[in-house]
Amino acid sequence: MPAAAGDGLLGEPAAPGGGGGAEDAARPAAACEGSFLPAWVSGVPRERLRDFQHHKRVGNYLIGSRKLGEGSFAKVREGLHVLTGEKVAIKVIDKKRAKKDTYVTKNLRREGQIQQMIRHPNITQLLDILETENSYYLVMELCPGGNLMHKIYEKKRLEESEARRYIRQLISAVEHLHRAGVVHRDLKIENLLLDEDNNIKLIDFGLSNCAGILGYSDPFSTQCGSPAYAAPELLARKKYGPKIDVWSIGVNMYAMLTGTLPFTVEPFSLRALYQKMVDKEMNPLPTQLSTGAISFLRSLLEPDPVKRPNIQQALANRWLNENYTGKVPCNVTYPNRISLEDLSPSVVLHMTEKLGYKNSDVINTVLSNRACHILAIYFLLNKKLERYLSGKSDIQDSLCYKTRLYQIEKYRAPKESYEASLDTWTRDLEFHAVQDKKPKEQEKRGDFLHRPFSKKLDKNLPSHKQPSGSLMTQIQNTKALLKDRKASKSSFPDKDSFGCRNIFRKTSDSNCVASSSMEFIPVPPPRTPRIVKKPEPHQPGPGSTGIPHKEDPLMLDMVRSFESVDRDDHIEVLSPSHHYRILNSPVSLARRNSSERTLSPGLPSGSMSPLHTPLHPTLVSFAHEDKNSPPKEEGLCSPPPVPSNGPMQPLGSPNCVKSRGRFPMMGIGQMLRKRHQSLQPSADRPLEASLPPLQPLAPVNLAFDMADGVKTQC
């Protein structure tokens, strides 16, 4: 649960940048050890909450007694966020008064919706939205610089360079609004605030209406109100567009340079005011203004909207960009959504680890710019941290450096884990298409991106008998061929195209099966076919002499997948209903009954099970002779007892990394997902009693032909 109000309160710390001696030097180190933020940033002094003058509390905000502004239906008051100790501006809209104006009632929530759509450095940031039975609250960032109108009153008028800076920022904000399809319609000096860095902050858009601008709903409207900033087409009730904001910018520019309004009439009359605008009877301009400023001002106050420049043309004006050291404003665009790389890792980690918010909630809220208490906490803590670091630049690099590394691991891990969790055989094919084959030098490193397996799999690992001598000879020849290829190939980087660790390497783990066709994938050995030989009644010793023992045909026993690997392995009834055609592989394959085979959900009934042959590489093709032929039981072969902790498997074992062949007819993922069902022998009587008598086995005759299949005779 998020921390309650008042948690983390502490005494008043030293101001950022102030003297503190050893205490200030030790505070950053202590903050890094136990917290992701300095104590001055994460803590809230009790005196700050106690001394703040307020008359009520709404949510996590104290509504202060100081009034920042007032309108017809709303009042802007200073507030305090109790969780961060930061001051905010709270716009309180009286619902009862707003009901008197149907337009305001209908568009009451439009301002909050628009501000959540927009992000710009010269537009106030909306932090939170609250609503009660009688009031509607908009919590925004506080602009300590006050109103621009107050600054003009103090200075009488602004210098041309200072006014140019403000106008450039105002046009940039309006251009961003127009790009998003928003027309402010109420640009005036009172709606231009200044932040702590003396930058323009545009406020109060979304609630203005035509009636308020025209002055009909408010009989006390004067020349200092909205009608003095309205464009001629708006006063004439003609069809208007975004260029009405360009006219209002011209009025604001005139007010900054002269301290007065460009068009005034005595006594006030809308008809007389409109006539002055159309006739271009502008009040006199100061003589010290440059010709560029006068020319630009007259173009903005053009009464004909067709001849008036649009906001993009105004932003590209030569006078506006004169002596401007930054990028040309018309070429600068601001995204309405913050990117993941721009998130403050220290603030996000503090909110998730200390305040108890979910990591996904914090990131999604900030990235979507959704006004709520999570966005308010993040914005205020981040601003507080920036203010702290600006006063202590010497510890900016050392402050919570571990949080930057932690942020990389924690917030970029989902992207890497998503890429790493792609289907393995699909990534194998993509990698194989680019780099053809993996160098064998990487196989010896033993690095393998494997998955954790259950402990039951480690206990049930099967052991296999030594294969025949002829098979071992062919495997050794294949191994020598691989060594020759390894010497002729160059090494490849250890990183794949996804930026992850190279998974195409040989592994020494018995739980991982690797293929010589570069399709390396972690799978438990019980999921692969196992070579099972007929048990012999007598095993001669190493030194025994006599007639050499006949080699029994090898059969592949398909075992169950993950759901049944903890049970004992059993033998299935074999049937000659399927004919396997093997090319270039001297191995005898057992036939199985298709009616007793359990397939994975992704394969149709009657499809063939994949077989793993102990050669490299082996091309296997499957042909189904007769689906309707009845199954015929020929015989069963029982496996020898399998110890749980057997020695390391020989090269001829299917568990060996070089014992699987490439199957071009299906992907490695499909082959490994096949599930095979085995028969459970009765436990009350031995297996030999339930089996039919076995016929003596004849020597195995293997015929190799590229056109014909391998024929096995039992």
Swiss-Prot record:
Basic and acidic residues bias: start-end ranges: 437-461, 623-635
Catalysed reaction equations from the record: L-seryl-[protein] + ATP = O-phospho-L-seryl-[protein] + ADP + H(+); L-threonyl-[protein] + ATP = O-phospho-L-threonyl-[protein] + ADP + H(+)
Limits of the Protein kinase domain: 62-320
GO molecular function terms listed in the Swiss-Prot or TrEMBL record: ATP binding; protein serine kinase activity; protein serine/threonine kinase activity
A biological process term (GO) from this entry: intracellular signal transduction
Residue segments, region Disordered: 1-26, 437-471, 518-552, 590-660
Low complexity bias (residue ranges): 1-15, 599-611
Binding site for ATP: L68, G69, E70, G71, S72, F73, A74, K75, V76, K91
EC number of this enzyme: 2.7.11.1
Keywords: ATP-binding, Kinase, Nucleotide-binding, Serine/threonine-protein kinase, Transferase
Tagged with keyword ATP-binding: yes
Active site per database record: D186
A GO-annotated cellular component: cytoplasm
Superkingdom as given in the UniProt entry: Eukaryota
Family membership: Belongs to the protein kinase superfamily. CAMK Ser/Thr protein kinase family. SNF1 subfamily.
Name of the protein in question: Hormonally up-regulated neu tumor-associated kinase
